[in-house]
C-alpha cells in the first residue's frame, strides 16, 4: 500500500509533483532520487508487462517545454540506460507523439515528461505502452516499486540515441491532410488558407512550421510558438478564458480563416472559426462528432457528463448518431468507447469538453494535433463546396445562460461527504414539482427543469481527484440560471460539509 509521500504523486493515470522552486509554500518533492526511483519502477513494471528483461526493452522519452524537463529527461534516460535498455531521446515532443513511437519505432514503452497545463514549477511522468496510456492501478504499482526501493539489475548494454521523431510525426499529419483534401495542388492543399496557431509557449509550435506552412498555409499572426517553460503569456489551456481570448483575437486581427489552440503537451486542442467564434467545449464536441459520424451512420459518441442538452439533440436528431453521456476524466470516456466497440457497438469518437478527443481511426489516442488536423481537413473540403466551417454546426442549440460553481468540501473524508449529498439530493429532487432527474446520467446527479422552473438543467458531481463538488448549470431562458441555482440552494443550505 502506498504511503502518504508516494500517494501525493498519483494524479489519476499520471504522476505529478513539484519539480522546481519558485512558488511560495510549494517545496520540490520530485527530487532527483525520487524521479530515479520512479524511472526504475517503470522499467520493472514494463518488463513484467511485455515479458522482456529490462536489458531487452526499447523505451522512448520526450518532454514538454517546462523548465525542469531537460533535467528530468537526463535522470530518466540515464536510469533506463543503466538497466541495459535501448533509449530513444526525443527531446521536445508532444504527448501523443510519444505514444506513436510505440507504433512507428517499435518501442515497448514511452515516457512523456509533462504536467499538462499546470504551473511552471510542476512536472510529471506520463507513460505509454502499445496498448495506450496506463491505468491508475498501473501507476500505483510503479509508485510502489519506487517506495519499496526496488531496482532492475544493472547492465552495461544500454544506450541513448537522440531521435527527431517530431519531424516524422508532423510528416504523417501532412500526408493525411494531402490525401483527404486531395487538392488540385496536391502538395499544397492549404494554399490560400490563413490559419493561426496558439501554442501557449508549449510543445505545439511545430504545428505552424512543420505542418501548416509546409502545406501552403499562411500562419502569419500565430502566437507564442516558441517553447518557454515559464509560460509568460497565458496558461496553455484551451479551457482557460485568457487562452481562448488570445487565439480569438489573433484570428480577428490577422483576418484568418481558422485558428487552432493547444495545451502544453498537445493532447488537447480547440479551434476558432473565421468570425472569431470559439470552437471549444460543446461546439468542439459537435464539430468532432459531425466529422466522426461521416461513414459511421448511427454511430455512438461518448462524452463526459457536463455536455449540454442541445448537444445531445444535435448528435441524435441532426447527425443521426447516438450520444452516450459518461463521466469526467478523459481516460474514462476513452475506456468506455473501447468497451462499447468491444461489444460490437459502432463508436468512432470519445471526447471530453476539455478538448481531449480520441478517434477510433487513430488508436483512440487523445491527440490535439490530430483533432485540429481533422477540423482543418473538413474546413478545406467545405471550402471546395463554397461552404464555411461554421455551417457544420449551424443547427446546434446553445444555452442562453450557463455557469459553473465549484464548492469546496470541508470534510476530511470528502468522497463520503460528496456521495451523501448526491444521494440526499436525488431523493429531494424526486419529490419536487418541475424537477426531472435524468435517467441516463452516469456521474453525480443531473436534473432538468421545465420552463416555469428555470428552463434548463444542473449537474452536481464529485471532482475526479479533488475535494470539490463542481456544479454546472445551463438555461434557455433569461434569468433561468439564477432560478435553478436558487432552487438548488434551498437544498444545499440543509447540507453539512460544503463551503457555500
Question: Can you name each region flagged by the protein language model?
Answer:
Residues 7-24, 199, 203, 349-353, ...:
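Conserved phosphate/anionic-ligand binding catalytic regions in large, soluble enzymes, centered on
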Residues 44, 48, 52, 58-122, ...:
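N-terminal small/polar loop signature for handling phosphorylated ligands or for N-terminal nucleophile
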Residues 54-64, 88, 194-196, 299-305, ...:
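Short glycine-rich phosphate-binding loop at a beta-alpha junction
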Residues 81, 90, 143-175, 274-353, ...:
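Proline/glycine-rich low-complexity loops and linkers
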Residues 123-254:
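Gly/Ser/Thr-enriched, mixed-charge loops and adjacent short helices
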Amino acid at each position: 500500500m502506498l504511503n502518504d509521500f508516494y500517494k501525493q504523486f498519483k494524479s489519476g493515470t499520471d504522476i505529478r509533483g513539484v519539480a522546481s522552486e519558485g512558488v511560495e509554500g510549494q517545496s520540490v518533492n520530485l527530487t532527483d532520487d525520487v524521479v530515479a526511483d520512479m524511472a526504475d519502477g517503470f522499467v520493472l513494471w514494463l518488463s513484467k508487462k511485455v515479458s522482456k528483461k529490462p536489458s531487452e526493452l526499447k523505451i522512448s522519452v520526450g518532454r514538454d517545454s517546462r523548465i525542469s524537463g531537460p533535467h528530468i529527461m537526463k535522470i530518466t534516460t540515464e536510469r533506463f540506460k543503466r538497466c541495459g535498455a535501448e533509449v530513444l531521446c526525443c527531446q521536445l515532443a508532444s504527448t501523443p507523439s510519444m505514444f506513436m513511437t510505440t507504433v512507428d519505432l517499435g518501442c515497448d514503452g514511452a515516457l512523456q515528461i509533462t504536467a499538462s497545463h499546470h504551473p511552471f514549477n510542476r512536472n510529471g511522468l506520463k507513460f505509454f505502452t502499445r496498448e495506450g496510456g496506463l491505468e491508475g492501478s498501473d501507476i500505483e504499482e510503479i509508485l510502489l516499486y519506487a517506495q519499496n526501493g526496488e531496482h532492475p539489475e544493472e547492465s552495461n548494454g544500454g544506450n541513448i540515441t537522440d531521435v527527431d521523431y517530431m519531424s516524422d510525426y508532423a510528416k504523417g499529419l501532412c500526408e493525411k491532410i494531402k490525401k483527404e483534401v486531395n487538392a488540385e495542388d496536391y502538395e499544397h492543399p492549404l494554399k490560400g488558407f490563413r490559419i493561426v496557431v496558439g501554442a501557449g509557449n508549449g510543445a505545439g509550435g511545430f504545428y505552424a512550421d512543420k505542418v501548416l506552412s509546409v502545406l501552403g498555409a499562411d500562419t502569419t499572426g500565430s502566437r507564442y510558438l516558441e517553447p518557454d517553460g515559464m509560460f509568460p503569456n497565458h496558461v496553455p489551456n484551451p479551457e482557460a478564458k485568457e487562452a481562448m481570448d488570445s487565439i480569438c483575437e489573433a484570428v480577428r486581427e490577422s483576418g484568418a480563416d481558422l485558428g487552432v489552440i493547444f495545451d502544453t503537451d498537445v493532447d488537447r486542442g480547440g479551434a476558432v472559426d473565421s468570425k472569431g467564434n470559439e470552437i471549444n467545449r460543446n461546439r468542439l464536441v459537435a464539430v468532432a462528432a459531425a466529422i466522426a459520424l461521416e461513414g459511421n451512420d448511427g454511430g455512438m459518441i461518448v462524452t463526459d457528463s457536463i455536455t449540454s442538452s442541445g448537444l445531445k439533440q444535435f448528435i441524435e436528431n441532426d447527425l443521426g448518431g447516438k450520444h452516450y453521456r459518461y463521466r469526467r476524466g478523459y481516460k474514462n470516456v476513452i475506456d468506455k468507447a473501447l468497451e462499447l466497440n468491444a461489444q460490437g457497438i459502432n463508436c468512432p469518437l470519445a471526447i471530453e469538453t476539455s478538448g481531449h478527443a480520441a478517434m477510433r481511426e487513430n488508436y483512440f489516442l487523445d491527440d490535439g494535433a490530430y483533432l485540429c488536423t481533422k477540423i482543418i481537413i473538413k474546413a478545406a473540403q467545405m471550402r471546395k463546396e463554397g461552404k464555411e466551417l461554421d455551417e457544420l454546426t449551424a443547427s446546434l442549440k446553445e444555452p442562453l445562460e450557463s455557469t459553473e460553481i465549484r464548492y469546496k468540501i470541508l470534510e476530511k473524508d470528502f468522497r463520503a461527504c460528496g456521495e451523501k449529498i448526491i444521494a440526499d439530493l436525488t431523493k429531494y429532487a424526486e419529490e419536487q414539482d418541475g424537477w426531472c432527474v435524468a435517467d441516463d446520467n452516469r456521474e453525480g446527479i443531473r436534473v432538468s427543469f421545465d420552463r416555469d422552473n428555470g428552463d434548463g438543467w444542473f449537474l452536481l458531481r464529485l471532482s475526479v481527484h479533488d475535494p470539490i463538488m463542481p456544479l454546472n448549470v445551463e438555461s434557455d431562458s433569461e434569468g433561468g440560471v439564477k432560478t435553478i441555482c436558487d432552487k438548488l440552494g434551498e437544498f444545499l443550505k440543509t447540507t453539512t460539509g460544503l463551503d457555500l
